[in-house]
Regions:
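Phosphate-handling DNA/RNA-contact segment within nucleic-acid enzymes
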Residues: 9, 21, 36, 112-122, ...
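N-terminal structured subdomain of primase-like DNA metabolism proteins
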Residues: 5-111
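Phosphate/diphosphate-binding loops
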Residues: 318-322
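Positively charged, low-complexity/disordered segments
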Residues: 1-2
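Non-catalytic interaction/clamp surfaces of large macromolecular machines
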Residues: 111, 115-160
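Short, conserved phosphate-binding/catalytic loop or strand-edge motifs used
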Residues: 61-62, 95-99, 107, 146-151, ...
Length: 322
């Protein structure tokens, strides 16, 4: 819904949506319900079960599975079932119940924040495409980057799926190409793809590395990780990651969550591994319900993210990784 980009749903409208949404009707779109006493029961849509333990209470306006614990009001149900954000679920219900959404205009400050965020995502998309192109079509990309991924045993379809790339040895190759294409220096710096030197030169943060884009839950590129391949220069950090930014808060993101969320719901379990390549290797061997916290222990924000899909987290750190 790009139509809604610049607006917010006001509280009065939210209240009207919540009042109108009949929990039994909302759940019935997805679950076959039978009346039992004052409530309704059905098979839980969030885990596999033979005996109905999913209960819906019209009087309370709530649903709950007594086996897996998932549930809540109509909005929570739609968020969980359709993997929607809170505003998306509200819009879904507004549409179902023909409620017109009166949206307040954003303040100029809010508009600026939003257009900054959009510009940053656009720059990140450009960088992802740029790194992917180098991996496939540039001589170093193929002989160094692609060779490394092939040596790890990664298939081409997996390399494409995770949008892997390569950055050349040039210290400002990305910066120059981006400026030439009309991207603003401001956003190259804000995303952390580039930085300014003391004498005001624009330099790339990532060079001579294989590149791993980090995706949000909805598949947008928020950050990058780059791994150095040459071993001669011992001073180089093995991994370089995007710095925190307006769009990237490391403690709220998990590598691979976008590619894993459906499998996590289906298997009702999430495997947590250490690094990017562990996630990719497991996908390639058919295990898709896997994410990486990139070496750090799980933050409360990351745990909340996983808990949107399952309560079961299994940690597979070095030693367990076959």
């Amino acid at each position: 819904g790009d139509v809604y980009k610049r607006q917010m749903i006001d509280q009065a409208t939210i209240d009207r949506i919540l009042d109108a949404a009949q929990i039994v009707e909302v759940v019935s779109d997805f679950v076959t319900l039978r009346k039992r006493g004052v409530n309704y029961v059905g098979l839980c849509p969030f885990h596999n079960e033979k005996t109905p333990s999913f209960s819906v209470s019209p009087s309370k306006g709530l649903c709950k599975c007594f086996s897996c614990g998932k549930g809540g009001n109509a909005v929570h149900f739609i968020m969980e079932h359709e993997q929607m954000s809170y505003p998306e679920a509200l819009r879904y219900l507004a549409k179902k119940y023909n409620i017109e959404i009166k949206e307040r205009e954003l303040t100029n400050e809010e508009k600026e924040v939003q257009s900054n965020r959009e510009s940053m995502f656009i720059v990140n998309n450009f960088a992802r495409d740029y790194f992917q192109n180098i991996l496939k079509n540039h001589i170093d990309g193929r002989s160094i980057g692609l060779a490394y991924f092939r040596q790890r045993g990664f298939r081409d379809d997996i390399i494409d799926k995770f949008q892997l790339g390569f950055s050349t040895e040039g210290r400002d190759a990305l910066a120059q190409e981006a400026l030439r294409k009309g991207f603003k220096q401001e956003f190259l710096v804000k995303t952390g793809l580039c930085y300014e030197t003391d004498d005001h030169k624009l330099r790339d943060r990532f060079w001579g590395r294989v590149m791993f884009p980090v995706h949000t839950l909805s598949g947008k590129v928020v950050a990058f990780g780059g791994r150095v391949l040459s071993t001669e220069n011992k001073k180089l950090a093995k991994y370089v990651n995007s710095p925190e930014s307006e769009i990237y808060h490391k403690s709220n993101e998990l590598y691979g969550i976008y590619f894993a969320k459906q499998a996590i719901v289906k298997q009702d379990r999430c495997f947590l591994v250490e690094g990017y390549t562990d996630v990719i290797s497991m996908h390639q061997s058919g295990v898709e319900n896997v994410v990486a916290s990139s070496g750090t222990s799980l933050t409360p924000g990351q745990i909340r993210l996983i808990h949107r899909f399952t309560n079961n987290i299994t940690v597979l750190y070095d030693g367990d990784m076959a």
